């Protein structure tokens, strides 16, 4: 459920090169009834304006495959762990 995801201390995010790609990802994932949130891109990842999709690590493979199959261009995938007030961010390999 999105409310659980909102308060999660461990999650993944997809980043996109353009807002249009993020909006397309949102549309695709909504059509799949996926559990996700659209959030501002974390400063630890990028200082430019942008949107990211936040989701549970358990759904990484399925959501990534669905986005690729629907021709959504994903720029990066990151694992995020909250440590107090800071985020520990690890870039994951696109496959």
What are these regions (language model features)?
Residues 1, 47, 88-90:
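Terminal low-complexity, poorly structured segments
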Residues 1-34:
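N-terminal first-folded block
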Residues 9-12, 48-51, 75:
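Short, surface-exposed beta-edge/turn micro-motifs
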Residues 19, 30-68:
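Amphipathic, hydrophobic secondary-structure cores in small proteins
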Residues 24-30, 54, 82-86, 90-91:
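Context-gated lysine
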Residues 61-95:
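C-terminal structural segments of small proteins and small subunits
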């Amino acid at each position: 459920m999105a409310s659980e995801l909102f308060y999660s201390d461990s999650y993944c995010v997809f980043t996109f090169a353009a807002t249009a790609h993020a909006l397309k990802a949102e549309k695709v994932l909504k059509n799949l009834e996926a559990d996700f949130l659209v959030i501002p891109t974390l400063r630890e990842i990028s200082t430019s304006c942008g949107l990211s999709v936040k989701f549970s690590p358990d759904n990484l493979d399925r959501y990534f495959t669905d986005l690729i199959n629907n021709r959504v261009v994903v720029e990066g995938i990151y694992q995020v762990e909250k440590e107090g007030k800071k985020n520990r961010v690890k870039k994951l390999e696109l496959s």
